[in-house]
Swiss-Prot record:
InterPro entries registered for this protein in UniProt: SDH, SDH_sf, SDHAF2
GO biological process: mitochondrial electron transport, succinate to ubiquinone; mitochondrial respiratory chain complex II assembly; protein-FAD linkage; tricarboxylic acid cycle
Name of the protein in its database record: Succinate dehydrogenase assembly factor 2, mitochondrial
Species per Swiss-Prot/TrEMBL record: Eremothecium gossypii (strain ATCC 10895 / CBS 109.51 / FGSC 9923 / NRRL Y-1056) (Yeast)
Listed GO CC annotations: mitochondrial matrix; mitochondrion
């Protein structure tokens, strides 16, 4: 049985009835309706969407650091914001070009995945093979243990 709850939720969030929503979002809703199916009424299905990162050519190391500071601070999930912004304030200015590229790749992952990997919660989100031997992720995991027992807060921009 095909479920349309995603499109109903999408339409409802914009205050539109589902029939009217397809008129305004004709390319999104039919795709969303076909994105998954369920065997029984009430089956929960998780839909994960990952957007391909923008290729940045000719970016200097300083430009990359500035972008990574922003991306570390403005994730959209408070837990990940606090973790990554503190990590970036502590380590970003000392990273090599190779480490910056690895950190950049890590930031292209989904927010909750980064959080669960950093906190070593493999039950919620298993760590992919790609990140098994990552130096940056190991550093982030060590940082997330908060051995100094400090209260995490968003660091000032002057700390970067």
């Amino acid at each position: 049985m095909l479920r349309f709850s995603f499109s109903h939720a999408f339409a409802g969030s914009y205050g539109l009835a589902p029939a009217r929503a397809t008129r305004f979002y004709p390319r999104i809703l039919p795709f969303a309706a076909r994105a998954y199916s369920a065997d029984k009424q009430g089956d929960d299905v998780i839909l994960r969407v990952k957007v391909a990162p923008i290729k940045r050519n000719n970016e200097t190391l300083e430009q990359q650091r500035a972008r990574l500071v922003y991306q570390s601070r403005k994730r959209g999930i408070l837990e990940t914001d606090l973790l990554l912004s503190g990590f970036a304030a502590k380590y970003l200015k000392h990273m090599t070009a190779e480490e910056l590229n690895e950190y950049d790749e890590l930031l292209n992952e989904l927010d909750w995945d980064i959080y669960y990997w950093a906190t070593k919660n493999s039950d919620a989100s298993p760590l992919p093979e790609k990140w098994q031997h990552s130096k940056i992720l190991r550093k982030l995991q060590a940082y997330s243990e908060n051995k100094d027992k400090q209260i995490l807060k968003m660091p000032d921009l002057s700390e970067f």
